[in-house]
Amino acid sequence: MDFNFTQNENDFRQEIKDWLSKNLSQRISNKVKKFQRLDKNDYEEFMKALSAKGWLAVNWPKEHGGTGWSNTQKHIFEEEIVKAGAPRIVPFGLNMLGPVLMEFGNEKQKKYYLPRILNCDDWWAQGYSEPGSGSDLASLKTKAVDHGDHYICLLYTSDAADEHSW
């Protein structure tokens, strides 16, 4: 069994390296390599560049804007973005909501939300990851303040404290 990469796979690797050298800012790469905190703008800058290239949704099918890559291509891509010092791709919309919508969403939902995830217009978060609880749903605590005809509930969400969509 030959475990070497094929010439096409090596060419693909080189294409990724070349693209990263031109599209991953040194500022962001330096922050990643120095383990400095990245803000939303840093993630968004890189993810929008990947989206423009068509490389953001590596696990999505082509018909929904994904790459259609093989598992080997996905591996090569992940390996090269790590080597280059790229930020991780923020996964909630891409890896959690998107696949659920593709499987169970109606056409209107797919048409509206999937492109917004790919364009970084919408950022999704795991709504049950709270301070002091993590993903332990039984330990979640909040309060509801009565405002007459509605209540205000205070919740914190990991990686999206400044984001909301009503």
Language-model features: locations:
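Internal helix-loop-helix
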Residues: 44-47, 51-111, 115-121
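A short, Trp-centered hydrophobic/proline-enriched beta-strand micro-motif
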Residues: 120-128
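Short secondary-structure junction/hinge motifs that connect adjacent elements
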Residues: 27-50
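Conserved small/polar residues in nucleotide/adenosyl-binding loops
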Residues: 156-163
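Active-site-adjacent elements of ketosynthase-type condensing enzymes
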Residues: 132-140
